[in-house]
Regions:
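Surface-exposed, charge/polar-rich loops and edge strands
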Residues: 1-57, 67-213
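Juxtamembrane extramembrane loops of integral membrane proteins
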Residues: 58-62
Length: 213
């Protein structure tokens, strides 16, 4: 007796659809992998290049993200804010973001780095409040994009989740004629000694796990 194979309709359709979805997901993962690898390489190239000394002369369209900078000016500590939900070596804390007035009177936001909950209050870390003119080395960063599940910034209640210069300057009521909204600067940690706030180490901290699923 000859048995004729007759595939069931709905299981077959489900299998085909699943196959198409998996192929599409794999293609998307590869594209993300190539994009992330290019981003990491760009970070290395720009951050290790000769620093520019007056980034305020450039708009976002004329200055590359991750470009190394070296600027002079003074911190406006009275207007610092705190980005919540940040960790350092598994410890919860905040990133301290402080306006920085450069020699040409332009004001740019500096992400000075991480502090623990116990040092969020500037009165408990007066040693970190540099006074007068200082030299700062850092890396240009474009305004952050709010993630889908990330709450909106709420400056009135002291909750900041995303570094968006336009929002921050508006909240601290800084003269819009002097502020830089196109980017902010990640401060680099200097030397081997770790001091608060803990700035970036100049290495690409960009997770690349798009082939590990």
């Amino acid at each position: 007796m000859k048995i004729q194979f007759r595939p069931m309709l709905w299981p077959s359709i489900f299998s085909i659809v699943t196959f198409i979805i998996l192929c599409s997901f794999g293609t998307w993962q590869l594209k993300r992998l190539y994009w992330k690898e290019a981003l990491i390489q760009r970070y290395i190239t720009e951050s290790q290049s000769n620093p520019i000394s007056n980034p305020s002369e450039f708009s976002k369209s004329k200055i590359n993200e991750f470009k190394a900078v070296e600027i002079f000016g003074k911190f406006l500590h009275i207007n610092e804010i705190y980005i919540t939900g940040k960790t350092y070596e598994g410890n919860a804390g905040f990133h301290v973001v402080t306006p920085f007035k450069m020699e040409n009177n332009k004001i740019v936001l500096i992400n000075r780095g991480w502090v623990s909950e116990g040092y969020k209050d500037p009165n408990k870390r007066k040693f970190s409040l540099a006074e007068g003119q200082v030299k700062l080395k850092g890396i240009i960063r474009y305004p952050q994009q709010k993630g889908y599940f990330v709450p909106e910034n709420d400056g009135e209640n002291g909750f900041w989740f995303t570094i968006i210069p336009n929002q921050i300057f508006k909240f601290i009521k800084t003269n819009s004629n002097f502020v830089i909204k196109d980017y902010y600067i990640d401060a680099l940690r200097l030397g081997e000694k770790i001091t608060l706030p803990i700035g970036v180490d100049g290495k690409p901290n960009l997770r690349n796990q798009h082939l590990s699923y």
